[in-house]
């Protein structure tokens, strides 16, 4: 009986050993498999990183690799957001509320800001404009509050800054308070395009208006006709409105309308369609576009050509409005030469 019991115990011990051996073997295969998978993942990530970066440097840890990949994804997201912001800027969105000179926010959105281009020696013309349609003092404020029309003379500085001509403008402005003085512009024909560009930029930054108009100081503006015409274009976010024209580009240096960059307009030397420079209007979004891109917008010899060139490659509605042809006066005309 003792021999039989001893045999049973020996058999049971062998079975336990066999089971333990099998379990250990399976565990070894499992651990080896997991280690193999992790090593393969590590190798794949390293190879992928080398492929993307073009570098065959020594392997880095998986954690560092994942951090690099996550960082790149964040950069892609940031780039996408920057593109959306750029697009929003081109649409005319602004991130701040426009304010008046005293720091208070505007309550009613102006219809249009009119910049009247004037020169240092043109006081008589300015006085004629004030008397004819612009007004001064209380009447100028009434034009803003009741009609939503802000009118300002736009002028640069003398080539000799601080001279008697500059002081004369400062004195006049202290009496009338109806100037936009652009300190970065020298009053000279060759800076006319820069003057218009900086006016649009300044006005768009200061006033949140529906429209912005460029005019000259020897025309009469029919405010009621202007308001009626602009009201018809309130739903168009990118409109360029004026008396449209095109014509010959003059390459002769002695010609009145000489264009130094005439060769850019092709063999036929013809301008693209653009508005006469006496008066034209652009919408808020286009004025914001000029403001944002003021440093890279090219200027030609003539300001009306320059303005047209800024919009020729954009999705802009060109409105050929005969009422802006100031030389053809009628009862419905918006402007007329004086």
From Swiss-Prot:
Residues 33-338 are lumenal. It is an enzyme of class 2 (transferase). It is a single-pass type II membrane protein. The keyword Glycosyltransferase applies. GO terms for cellular component: endosome; Golgi apparatus; Golgi medial cisterna; Golgi membrane; trans-Golgi network. GO terms for molecular function: hydroxyproline O-galactosyltransferase activity. Residues 1-12 are cytoplasmic. GO terms for biological process: arabinogalactan protein metabolic process; protein O-linked glycosylation via hydroxyproline. It holds the Pfam family DUF4094. It comes from the Eukaryota. Its EC number is 2.4.1.-. Signal peptide: none annotated. The chain crosses the membrane at residues 13-32. Its cofactor is Mn(2+). Expressed in roots, rosette leaves, cauline leaves, stems, flowers and siliques. It is found in: Golgi apparatus membrane. Disruption phenotype: Reduced levels of arabinogalactan proteins. Keywords: Glycosyltransferase, Golgi apparatus, Manganese, Membrane, Signal-anchor, Transferase, Transmembrane, Transmembrane helix. Its main location: Golgi. Pathway: Protein modification; protein glycosylation. Possesses hydroxyproline O-galactosyltransferase activity. Transfers galactose from UDP-galactose to hydroxyproline residues in the arabinogalactan proteins (AGPs). Is specific for AGPs containing non-contiguous peptidyl hydroxyproline residues. The addition of galactose onto the peptidyl hydroxyproline residues in AGP core proteins represents the first committed step in arabinogalactan polysaccharide addition. AGP glycans play essential roles in both vegetative and reproductive plant growth. Belongs to the glycosyltransferase 31 family. This is Hydroxyproline O-galactosyltransferase HPGT1. It comes from Arabidopsis thaliana (Mouse-ear cress).
């Amino acid at each position: 009986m003792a021999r039989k019991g001893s045999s049973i115990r020996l058999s049971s011990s062998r079975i336990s050993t066999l089971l333990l051996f099998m379990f250990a073997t399976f565990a070894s295969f499992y651990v080896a498999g997991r280690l193999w998978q992790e090593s393969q993942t590590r190798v794949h990530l390293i190879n992928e990183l080398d492929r993307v970066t073009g570098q065959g440097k020594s392997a880095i840890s998986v954690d560092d690799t994942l951090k690099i990949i996550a960082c790149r994804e964040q950069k892609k997201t940031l780039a996408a957001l920057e593109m959306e912001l750029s697009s929003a800027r081109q649409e005319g969105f602004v991130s701040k509320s426009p304010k008046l000179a005293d720091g208070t926010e505007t309550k009613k959105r102006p219809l249009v800001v009119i910049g009247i281009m004037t020169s240092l020696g043109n006081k008589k013309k300015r006085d004629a404009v004030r008397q004819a349609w612009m007004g001064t003092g209380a009447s100028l404020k009434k034009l803003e509050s009741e009609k939503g029309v802000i009118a300002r003379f736009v002028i640069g500085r003398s080539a000799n800054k601080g001279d008697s001509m500059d002081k004369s403008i400062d004195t006049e402005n202290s009496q009338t308070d109806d100037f936009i003085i652009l300190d970065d512009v020298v009053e000279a024909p060759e800076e006319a395009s820069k003057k218009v560009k900086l006016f649009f930029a300044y006005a768009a930054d200061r006033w949140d208006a529906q429209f912005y108009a460029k005019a000259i100081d020897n025309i009469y503006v029919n405010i009621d006709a202007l308001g009626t015409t602009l009201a018809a274009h309130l739903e168009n976010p990118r409109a360029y409105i004026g008396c449209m024209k095109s014509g010959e580009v003059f390459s002769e240096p002695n010609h009145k309308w000489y264009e130094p960059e005439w060769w850019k307009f092709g063999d036929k030397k013809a301008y693209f369609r653009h508005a006469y420079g006496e008066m034209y209007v652009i919408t808020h979004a286009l004025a914001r576009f000029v403001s944002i891109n003021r440093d890279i917008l090219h200027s030609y010899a003539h300001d009306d050509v320059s303005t047209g060139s800024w919009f020729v490659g954009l999705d802009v509605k060109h409105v050929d409005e005969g009422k802006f042809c100031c030389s053809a006066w009628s009862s419905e005309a918006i402007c007329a030469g004086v």
